[in-house]
């Protein structure tokens, strides 16, 4: 493998794009056309950068990935960024490793709020962008309008004149072609490679100084343990070299580097020596944390810690206490759940976990509902069982005043739904900032809304727009609290009054009371929520009742039982649906919704105490 690297031929670049604007496909094509793939393996899996099952399913990138491409003697390190503000912790770290950003924007949609979030961070780091207008071949593409939108966005984000003088490349990643004009695309991606080489500066580093690097990502491997990934700030590193590790508190310890791993395509390979400016992985240093500095034993200097946005949403993770606990999951105890959460903390820097006075409950805080639901979904797939409460926003005391988080929301809906959506957002204390009709029957709305107004809104929004609306949000700022309750659920729920098998006959009778959430012949337990009541109060119902068979020849004997299809919630929908006195029970097999207090008597008693305390 190559040992020497000409620093002037090295380029480090991060890719920024909104969900579904074609970032992952673009990287796939760059890897193929640079010939990097032929050397590692024959055929290429679609979406090679998304390595986690959840990422492939949802089409979102959660964890940042690294890959390297060799093109005409140049070596280009490409780091993928999560496009979603909920993963702000990941974004910060990626930007500390690169010298420029590649902003991929859809030729029809234009820049979206999640792109805005990452771009803002990139400008704050002083990085200069290269803009790729992707999907220029799609019907309705309007590349010139998109370029204007991008320019306006950059001006709004306070870009410098240098940053505003950005090169534009037009591309169709799916077909693997790019060009400097959208009417004239080259045969392949060469114009994009040339733009990267020409406009991205090589890393400004000192090759002869003592070694220093900061860990900005962690990986784990059963054979070598913790792997630290980062960009070498100065100097060079070899396997077996003794180093000093400085953690966030400034404590130092000695260590010896195991392997030094470089990236090529999606593979890692061992190097004999790595130089400043390159992005590498090193093993053999035991427990590492993000932001640790690794340096030469004779020049112990810590690099400034990486800052991460504070969490804005918190929820409780509890041990599953339902009557069906332990039937479907492998890990069910509080110790196992806490161990898993602590393991997550190692690389998920925007997460916080606090123990509570109740040993079976942990307070977990993150950057948003998506951030936390991805963690819950991952735990569920690994065989964990747990119950989670409704998300609540985190208030802050700023200058003696209590403040709450606000989000910037972009909504894209058909004109016929505009009125009802605006009314619903008004009730949730949203303020309109902008309104852009696209002239083709759709409208884009920009809002600033308190984060608590968004909790539970997505499901309602999808129903309101019959699934045709798009809703994107990203954290904006903290500000004074808006008075009044926001976003309470309008409907009550149907609650099972006993444990057993739900029978079709009983469910048939309950259909007129509301929408059911379970199929016939499913096991339910007392206190489980089996449907949505059509009125605003909760109703405890019997869904185990069979048909009485005494009057065999009664006239109603042959009425066929027809059950409507039940409402099935995904994990996110369930978390958004529940109220403060309810929990979502999450197991590897099922997602159930239940009341915190399972018996009707307990609920009535709790209700009485809350009413009496509120009247006194």
Question: Residues of each region from the PLM?
Answer:
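Conserved short loop/turn motifs at secondary-structure junctions
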Residues: 14, 133-140, 177, 181-185, ...
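Amphipathic helical hotspot of TIR/SEFIR-family domains
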Residues: 110-126, 147-150
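Residue-level signature of catalytic and energy-coupling elements of molecular machines
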Residues: 20, 26, 59, 80, ...
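Short glycine-/polar-rich loops that comprise or flank the Walker A/P-loop
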Residues: 74, 98-101, 125-129, 163-166
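Canonical P-loop GTPase G-domain recognition
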Residues: 128, 138-198
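Accessory interaction regions appended to the cores of large information-processing enzymes
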Residues: 165-167, 194-198, 202, 228-264, ...
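P-loop NTPase switch module centered on the Walker A-proximal segment
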Residues: 1-105, 109-111, 149, 218-221
């Amino acid at each position: 493998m190559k040992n020497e690297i000409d620093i002037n031929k090295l380029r480090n670049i991060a890719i920024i794009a909104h969900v579904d604007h074609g970032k992952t496909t673009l990287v796939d094509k760059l890897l193929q056309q640079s010939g990097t793939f032929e050397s590692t393996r024959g055929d290429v899996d679609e979406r090679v950068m998304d390595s986690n099952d959840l990422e492939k399913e949802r089409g979102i990138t959660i964890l940042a990935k690294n890959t390297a491409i060799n093109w005409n003697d140049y070596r280009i390190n490409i780091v993928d960024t999560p496009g979603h503000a909920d993963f702000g912790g990941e974004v910060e770290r990626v930007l500390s490793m690169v010298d420029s950003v590649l902003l991929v924007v859809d030729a029809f949609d234009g820049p979206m709020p999640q792109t805005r979030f990452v771009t803002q961070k990139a400008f704050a780091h002083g990085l200069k962008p290269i803009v790729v207008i992707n999907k220029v071949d799609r019907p309705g593409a309007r590349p010139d309008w998109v370029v204007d939108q991008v320019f306006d966005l950059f001006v709004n984000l306070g870009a410098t004149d240098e940053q505003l003088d950005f090169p534009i490349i037009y591309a169709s990643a799916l077909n693997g072609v790019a060009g400097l004009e959208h009417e004239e695309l080259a045969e392949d991606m060469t114009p994009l490679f040339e733009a990267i080489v020409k406009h991205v500066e090589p890393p400004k580093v000192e090759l002869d100084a003592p070694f220093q690097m900061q860990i900005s990502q962690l990986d784990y491997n059963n054979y070598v343990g913790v792997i630290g990934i980062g960009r070498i700030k100065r100097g060079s590193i070899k396997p077996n070299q003794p180093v000093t590790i400085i953690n966030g508190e400034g404590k130092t310890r000695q260590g010896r580097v195991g392997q030094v791993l470089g990236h090529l395509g999606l593979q890692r390979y061992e190097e004999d020596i790595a130089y400043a400016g390159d992005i590498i992985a090193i093993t053999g240093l035991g427990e590492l944390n993000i932001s640790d500095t690794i340096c030469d034993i004779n020049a112990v200097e810590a690099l400034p810690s990486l800052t991460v946005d504070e969490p804005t949403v918190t929820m409780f993770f509890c041990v599953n206490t339902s009557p069906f606990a332990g039937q479907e999951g492998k890990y069910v105890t509080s110790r196992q759940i806490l161990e898993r959460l602590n393991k997550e903390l190692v690389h998920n820097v925007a997460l916080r976990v606090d123990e509570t006075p109740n040993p079976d409950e942990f307070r977990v805080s993150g950057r948003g509902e998506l951030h936390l639901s991805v963690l819950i979904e991952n735990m569920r797939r690994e065989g964990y069982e747990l119950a989670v409460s409704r998300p609540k926003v985190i208030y802050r005391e700023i200058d003696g005043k209590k403040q709450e988080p606000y989000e910037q929301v972009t909504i894209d809906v058909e004109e016929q739904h505009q009125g009802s959506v605006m009314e619903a957002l008004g009730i949730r204390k949203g303020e309109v900032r902008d309104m852009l009709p696209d002239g083709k029957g759709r409208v884009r709305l920009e809002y600033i809304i308190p984060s608590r107004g968004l909790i539970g809104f997505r499901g309602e929004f999808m129903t309101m727009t019959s699934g045709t609306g798009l809703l994107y949000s990203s954290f904006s700022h903290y500000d004074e609290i808006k008075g009044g309750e926001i976003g309470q659920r309008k409907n009550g729920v149907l609650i099972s009054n006993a444990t057993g098998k739900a029978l079709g006959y009983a469910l048939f009778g309950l259909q007129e009371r509301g929408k059911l959430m379970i199929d016939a012949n499913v096991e339910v337990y007392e206190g489980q929520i089996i449907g949505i009541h059509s009125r605003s109060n909760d109703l405890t119902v019997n869904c185990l009742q069979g048909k009485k068979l005494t009057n065999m020849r009664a006239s109603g004997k042959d009425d066929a039982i027809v059950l409507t299809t039940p409402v099935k919630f995904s994990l996110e929908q369930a978390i958004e649906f529940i109220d403060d006195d309810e929990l979502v029970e999450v197991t590897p097999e099922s997602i159930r919704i239940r009341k915190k207090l399972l018996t009707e008597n307990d609920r009535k008693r709790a209700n009485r105490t809350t009413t009496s305390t509120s009247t006194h």
